[in-house]
């Protein structure tokens, strides 16, 4: 990425974009057709946009300003004082939340239904409250299958093969 657009990389891998409208709009604005094509996945989008378009965006002062504002907003969000930080007494440094699946965003298809969506919403709300929660789960290399019907009416499943390097994931050790 051009220097002035480098914050887009961090914005893309922090899943807050999935519930932060302004950040989603920023990515969509880069190339609306590509945004639709990659299923609203900012990591995939950054790999899809041609270098010429990135240079064009880097020369657009208004766009660069929106990138800088989104970066500053994320920095404040991550470091800012929120509900949890205002609690009195001893607080845990981290809270583990265990679920076999998390429905955070379609760009990270690691859920199949209600349990995953509930777990994802719990992580999002905890994040907004400043709770130091860590979602511990499983990585399904095939993700969630897509359903279709055959010509004779039978359900058919298509399992996508997920490349962890192309997902908004970071391996922690």
Predicted regions and their residues:
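Catalytic cores of carbohydrate-active enzymes across secretory and cytosolic contexts
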Residues: 1-173
């Amino acid at each position: 990425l051009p220097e002035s657009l480098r914050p887009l990389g961090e914005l893309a891998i922090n899943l807050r974009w999935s519930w932060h409208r302004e950040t989603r709009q920023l990515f969509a604005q880069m190339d609306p057709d590509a945004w639709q094509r990659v299923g609203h996945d900012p990591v995939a989008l950054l790999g899809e946009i041609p270098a010429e378009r990135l240079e064009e965006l880097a020369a657009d002062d208004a766009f660069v300003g929106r990138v800088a504002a989104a970066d500053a907003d994320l920095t404040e969000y991550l470091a800012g004082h929120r509900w949890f930080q205002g609690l009195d007494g001893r607080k845990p440094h981290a809270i583990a939340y265990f679920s076999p699946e998390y429905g955070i965003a379609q760009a990270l298809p690691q859920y199949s239904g209600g349990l995953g969506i509930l777990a994802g919403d719990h992580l999002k709300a905890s994040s907004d409250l400043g709770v130091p929660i860590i979602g511990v789960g499983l990585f399904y290399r095939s993700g969630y299958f897509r359903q279709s019907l055959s010509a004779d009416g039978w359900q058919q499943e298509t399992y996508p093969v997920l490349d962890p390097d192309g997902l908004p994931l970071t391996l922690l050790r």
